[in-house]
Every structure is written in C-alpha cells, then in structure tokens.
Amino acid sequence: MTTDTHTLHIEEILELLPHRFPFLLVDRVLDFEKGKFLRAVKNVSFNEPFFQGHFPGKPIFPGVLILEAMAQATGILAFKSAGKLAPGELYYFAAIDEARFKRPVQPGDQMILEVEFIKERRGVARFKGVAKVDGEVACEASMMCARRREA
C-alpha cells in the first residue's frame, strides 16, 4: 500500500473496481483529487489477449477498450469522491458521447488516462476523459456513470 494519498497501486484499485484479468485496464493511479480529476496509467503489453486478432501483424489496442479504460478511471474517481457504496448499490457506466479517436495505441505504449469530474445530479455524474500516449491525444470522450440500487 502507498502512503501517498494521491496515488493508488493495483491492490487499492482492485478494492474499488470489480474488474479482473483480462478486463482490468487501469494499472496505477498517478494522481487524483476527490471530486475533481484523476490521472491513471495503462501499460499496453503485446501479451494482451486481444492482440492475437486485433490485428494479426499490425496489433492495435481496440478503441472500445480505450473507452473502457477511461470508464474504469472514471469509476475509480467516482468511488474515491463519493465513498464506498451502500450494500445493494452499484455504479453503472451509463453513457458515452462525443468519442473521438486521434491516433492508434500499440504494444509498448503507456496510455495516460485523464478524467475530470464535470457535475453530478440525482446520482448521475458526468465526466470528461482523455487518453494520451507520449503527450498526444489518442482518444477523448464525455462519459456518465450512475449510482443505483440493485433491483
């Protein structure tokens, strides 16, 4: 565990997110401020299982998984900002808008995920997300997540 309250290592991420291999797409939180922003990292390895078919001979990290990585970073920020969920509550990824892909992400890249809290109303929070490689925007989108009780 870390003593720096603005970073989170994988053990702490696993306590917050339900995702596990091969679908956990956040390796470490570099910095965050509750209710404001979060910066995280996803190290892209050639060993990712989807590279076998996306695409043979020209591996490219699937765009939908870049969005999922940003959504997971958003979930971590939501958990750290709003606190633990009550029994029977879940966070749901509710919407994505204005998604744009600017450059491919390839094995060996380190993807920096930056998410910013925009506003929250009646349990629905809006965020802005950007994924960057070497300072260059790979993807950007607006996202929403909803805090709801299980039916």
From Swiss-Prot:
EC number: 4.2.1.59
HAMAP family, sorted: FabZ
Top-level taxon in the UniProt lineage: Bacteria
Organism this protein belongs to: Sodalis glossinidius (strain morsitans)
GO terms under cellular component: cytoplasm; membrane
Pfam families associated with the record: FabA
Cited NCBIfam families: fabZ, PRK00006.1
Record's function text: Involved in unsaturated fatty acids biosynthesis. Catalyzes the dehydration of short chain beta-hydroxyacyl-ACPs and long chain saturated and unsaturated beta-hydroxyacyl-ACPs.
Catalytic activity: a (3R)-hydroxyacyl-[ACP] = a (2E)-enoyl-[ACP] + H2O
GO BP terms in the entry: fatty acid biosynthetic process; lipid A biosynthetic process
Active site location: 54
Protein name: 3-hydroxyacyl-[acyl-carrier-protein] dehydratase FabZ
GO molecular function terms noted in the UniProt entry: (3R)-hydroxyacyl-[acyl-carrier-protein] dehydratase activity
Keywords tagged on the record: Cytoplasm, Lipid A biosynthesis, Lipid biosynthesis, Lipid metabolism, Lyase
Family: Belongs to the thioester dehydratase family. FabZ subfamily.
Subcellular location(s) per record: Cytoplasm
